[in-house]
Every structure is written in structure tokens, then in C-alpha cells.
Amino acid sequence: VANGMEAAHKHHIVHRDIKPQNIIISKEGKVKVTDFGIAKAATSSTINSSAAMGSVHYMSPEQARGGYSDERSDIYSFGITLYEMLTGKVPFDGDTTVAVAVQHIQDAIPAPSEIAEDVPLSVDKIVLKCTQKKTERRYQTVSDLIADLKKSLVMPEEDFVKIAPMYAQ
């Protein structure tokens, strides 16, 4: 999935709706990201939207506010998708789409290991870094995310994922 996002981002395309329903596995076992229906071509500036775009359970805080989207919005949605893959549930749920959107904007995401205790430390921190509220605290590129995912395969319990302090701009 991250490799598919990386390919899209290299072509300056922001998906804006990364979620399990938009991930398919071919008969050959290849994972593909689908449904670029609300994708936008990214330019040197960010994408502005007057309406929130994406599926609310996987939506980044900036999308929930109806604001700008860039590659880091896809990274957030990937983090939510990974969270669900690891725990079997999304971190935020509610009776209305607005209630879920507000949680994406305001509430901290619990570490996946709080739900599924067998999640390794490095994977916990990868998910938490992907899902930071401020874009500046997330992975800045999918390439950086992929590097940490690969490292987590060989050093799952190592504490190598660095998350910027809360006061970072």
C-alpha cells in the first residue's frame, strides 16, 4: 500500500481516500491501491477544499476541517488503515460523521498495542507517527515511512521511530 502511495506521490497525485475498501489484492498476491475518484494533482501548493473529502473514519484532521490536503494527509489515512489492520477496529467511531471527524481533529489515538498487545514497539510508533494531528509531526514523505516499515521487519522491538516534540513547528 505504501509503495502504491509512493508511486502516486511521485507523480504529484494525492489520493485523499486511503482506506481498506480501496486496497485490493490480486490473484498473484499483489497489493494495489484503487479508487482515485477524489484524488487531486498536487502542485507546489497544497490542495484546498471547501468541503471535507474522504471517508470519515480514515480522514486526516486537515480534511475533516475542510482544509488543505497534501501527501501527509494520505500518510495519516494510511496510519488509520494500518491501525485497523493491527487491531480489527478503527480508533474513532461515533453516531454521526461529525462526531468522528471531531475526534480526528481533537482526540489522541491510543497506541495499537493497547488494543492488540502483540503489536511490536516499532509498529506502534510508526502508526502513532503517521497519525499525528499536525502534519509537521508526521512522516514528511512515504519514502521515509517505507524505510521505517522495512526496519521494523528486522528490528520490531527497537525504539528507532522518532516523533517530533509537541512544540515542533
Q: Where is each model-derived feature located?
A:
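Activation-loop N-terminal segment of eukaryotic-like protein kinases
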Residues: 25-29
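Conserved protein-kinase catalytic-loop position immediately C-terminal to the HRD catalytic Asp
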Residues: 21, 34
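Regulatory activation segment
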Residues: 31, 44-53
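C-terminal lobe helix-coil module of Hanks-type protein kinase domains
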Residues: 55-160
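Regulatory extensions appended to serine/threonine kinase catalytic cores
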Residues: 159-169
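Protein kinase catalytic-loop region centered on the HRD/HxD motif
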Residues: 1-13
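Residue immediately N-terminal to the catalytic "proton-acceptor" Asp
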Residues: 16
